[in-house]
Amino acid sequence: MSSSPNIGFISLGCPKNLVDSERILTELRSDGYNIISSYEGADLVIVNTCGFIDSAVQESLESIGEALENNGKVIVTGCLGAKENQIREIHPQVLEITGPHSYEAVMKHVHKYVPKPEYSPYTSLVPKQGIKLTPKHYAYLKISEGCDHRCTFCIIPSMRGDLDSRSIVHILDEAKRLVDAGVKEILVVSQDTSAYALDKKKENASKTVFWNGMPIKNDLITLCEKLGSLGAWVRLHYVYPYPHVDNLIPLMAEGKILPYLDIPLQHASPKILKMMKRPGSIERTLERIKKWREICPDLTLRSTFIVGFPGETEEDFQLLLDFLQEAQLDRVGCFKFSPVEGAVATDMEDQIPEEIKEERFHRFMQLQQKISAERLRQKIGRTLSVIIDEIDEEGIIGRTMADAPEIDGVVYVDNFSKVEVKLGQIINVTITNADEYDLWGEI
């Protein structure tokens, strides 16, 4: 039997794209290909691209160029792949280009240029949970593709299509495999998590689905309840502020899913929100936040905002700062508006000069850092559950229920030598200090 061919792989972009990469890698390994992390020795290189903002497009184009220069045989997939002409204009020598979540097309192209190897069908090449690019103790779980919203700053629907929710049975089966394989934290992702199954209402009304021998509804609340029964932390990301999101908060208060809500609000000026085609009642949002915290006092709220959107006046920006001050959000990300080819907002009048975007960005972050520092300071003296992400000679680094990997803060544990711990273990840590982003504590 000849040795298996090597496939190099580059994964760019968000966690949703990372899930696509994991799916492709699992398919490759199932077909007997070796996966390597270098260009040298690869029979072909796959680049899974991002195309959300111009800087991501540039990074993707540079990665394609690097792969071509160092290997020469390159297949491109992912969000930027939806703009084939843009890629061909700069890199005409790319072998094949597909759009996002085009798993079958990618595999077809791989087989064309690097024939499927022979291997023993009695040898399992893939773990039951599939190939994962995250540490063994946490994993991303994608519950749908695409989005039905048409936010004017975004081109995701043009690349990934309209909302297409996965079957609740398939999602729960995947989640159970992950937990059985040792995953301690499931991070639920999609373009629009709170829209899950809304596209399947008619279909779901006419049939009954079963999981573990019991009939279940195919909706977001049921999905969260069942995920919460598996024994792992369940964290929700990218939750659009629909009214039915209110129904998730009691599940968090009961401990069925983590008391953590990643809800991108984008702005606080009614005028700007209308121009963005986003929900515009900030007063209602503040009322909901107050109610959520009454129901679930330990709730962590994360959000993202855009400053420098076309037409944003100083008055609009001040409304955003006022909202931050009143809402007292726990975790906040801020982006300076970036024109994206194909986005409606790119062609709007009253584009904001870069120096004003920069100045507003710094004012925004300066205020939020003060808010974050105070909210974290309030945790000093409390004993919190912490999941361990890193262990080395200097100490332990972990995260509380309030911290998602990569985007939120961490907990540095000082006296770790007192007990034996391992990656993915959830331990109790007493918080002793805090800054604007991170915590320090002792076992």
Curated annotation (Swiss-Prot):
Localisation per UniProt entry: Cytoplasm
UniProt-listed Enzyme Commission number(s): 2.8.4.4
Gene3D superfamilies referenced in this protein's UniProt entry, alphabetically: Methylthiotransferase, N-terminal domain (3.40.50.12160), Nucleic acid-binding proteins (2.40.50.140), tm_1862 like domain (3.80.30.20)
Any one GO molecular function term: 4 iron, 4 sulfur cluster binding
InterPro entries in UniProt: Elp3/MiaA/NifB-like_rSAM, Methylthiotransferase, Methylthiotransferase_CS, Methylthiotransferase_N, Methylthiotransferase_N_sf, NA-bd_OB-fold, Ribosomal_uS12_MeSTrfase_RimO, rSAM
Superkingdom classification of source: Bacteria
GO cellular component: cytosol
Amino acids binding [4Fe-4S] cluster 2: 147, 151, 154
Domain MTTase N-terminal: 5-115
Domain Radical SAM core: 133-374
Function: Catalyzes the methylthiolation of an aspartic acid residue of ribosomal protein uS12.
Family: Belongs to the methylthiotransferase family. RimO subfamily.
Protein name as it appears in the record: Ribosomal protein uS12 methylthiotransferase RimO
Lineage of producing organism: Bacteria, Pseudomonadati, Pseudomonadota, Gammaproteobacteria, Pasteurellales
